Amino acid sequence: MTNAKFVDVTQHTSFMTFEQQEENPKLERPKLQKFLADAGLCSRRAGESWIEEGKVTVNGTVARLGERVSPLDDVVKVNGKVVRAQLPKLVTIAINKPKGYTCSNHDEFADRLIFELLPNRLLQTRLFCAGRLDVESEGLVIVTNDGSLAHRLTHPSQQIRKKYQLEIKQPLAGEHIPLMTQGIEDEGEFLRIDEIRAKSKSPVGETRLDIILGHGKKREIRRVFGHFRYQIKKLRRVSIGGLHLNKLPLGSFRELDQKEIDLLLPR
């Protein structure tokens, strides 16, 4: 082995939820000889020879030819030295999702997927959504290959505030506001709106509202307003944490720098 680099793979991992791993085939389980070749140690054929000769172990067990490994979870060694997993460069992107796009990497029933809005150069590493919008909604969605960031953005304990612009057909009744902010039960799940605002001093009687959530369960705004028989004309997410859509056109994207990523997270 010439110029081979070894390092403890656990120093290069990012936490990913099961759902994110399921939606991220790029971090699937490649065959061991491919993993070795991708790490720059050898050709696939040479890797096969090393495996057959018993030089390779996976999690302390002598490897078998054709065995698959997880680059993030398994510890692979060649002649007792840990192999560095060649993880992709971390990328985080803001997308202004139009209505009609599904926030998923694969969905056989979806007409269009959000990743179709990105150029091929950004799809060389498999991205996943760090929080979703339903197909009928539009606005700010964060996609990334950074599992640790995605976990922080989606974990309920973070309470990251998200702002939505909501348009309903019927004027908002004043008696419904405290009920929405106190919370309701729907399909055995507790749902609530953190804040309801309007451009006027009071949201009562308004049809265009600003909604604030510090959590965000599946279709939560639609379910809460639907509970009170409101019909939703439009729902748009305009900010996550301190990051705003600003002038990002509908259907467009922007790669985020570290300062913008930091805006997403609570201080």
Task: List each model region and its residues.
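Basic, flexible Lys/Arg- and Gly-enriched helix-loop patches that mediate nucleic-acid binding at interfaces
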Residues: 3, 9, 15-267
